[in-house]
From Swiss-Prot:
Pfam families: A24_N_bact, Peptidase_A24. This is Prepilin leader peptidase/N-methyltransferase. One of its GO terms (cellular component) is plasma membrane. InterPro entries: Peptidase_A24A_bac, Prepilin_IV_endopep_pep, Prepilin_pept_A24_N, Prepilin_peptidase/N-MTase. The gene is xpsO.
Amino acid sequence: MAFLDQHPGLGFPAAAGLGLLIGSFLNVVILRLPKRMEWQWRRDAREILELPDIYEPPPPGIVVEPSHDPVTGDKLKWWENIPLFSWLMLRGKSRYSGKPISIQYPLVELLTSILCVASVWRFGFGWQGFGAIVLSCFLVAMSGIDLRHKLLPDQLTLPLMWLGLVGSMDNLYMPAKPALLGAAVGYVSLWTVWWLFKQLTGKEGMGHGDFKLLAALGAWCGLKGILPIILISSLVGAVLGSIWLFAKGRDRATPIPFGPYLAIAGWVVFFWGNDLVDGYLRFAGLR
């Protein structure tokens, strides 16, 4: 770690390359985890309802199963799995079917690479930098899944929360107390908004996964990060959500996933939360 800190000319390219590899794996998580969950839900539903057991082959696993063409099912060659560059070499089209390859693949890989470089630039090549990479990767995966399926899996939100709490036990970013309070207040704050909205309208304004994601971000950003995360995510959500509705020609009743906006706000607050608070206090004349 010290070697990379002393030689950033090697460390930053290494972080960028690592980010591309992780981004390729995150694409697999984004595509396959919801399918595995839906398959398990159907099995559980048949068991609970005491319906006849119907054999349904499980979807491809996340780690073991090799990558394949999403249209034809052909196993990909090794060079077709090279992150980002394979998409460029294939000019965004499948070699087997000729159909376009989703822009999601290179975007997720490139974004993850940029976030990994930003993590080590901000926190260095030690454990803090590693933790920032872990947080960034979880947020990318959850945002991708929420955008596609309007779902924030417990398989991602809860481990992220526990990782933040475990890190606080070693005072990685903060002591344990503000991390615990951040997780608790993060969950309760959005749950309260959800409950009040449901009482007033009879509708659910957000999913329970949003509560858990904010709890996870509270474990990483601490209690003082909750309010900035809520404010930033609400602002970003209002602006980008309105643009998306206008571009798609949808009405205001169309549900919009809130997870990506929480992820953006949480990432910003985690990286620059103290600077944001200090800047606001100086602007308000309170410091």
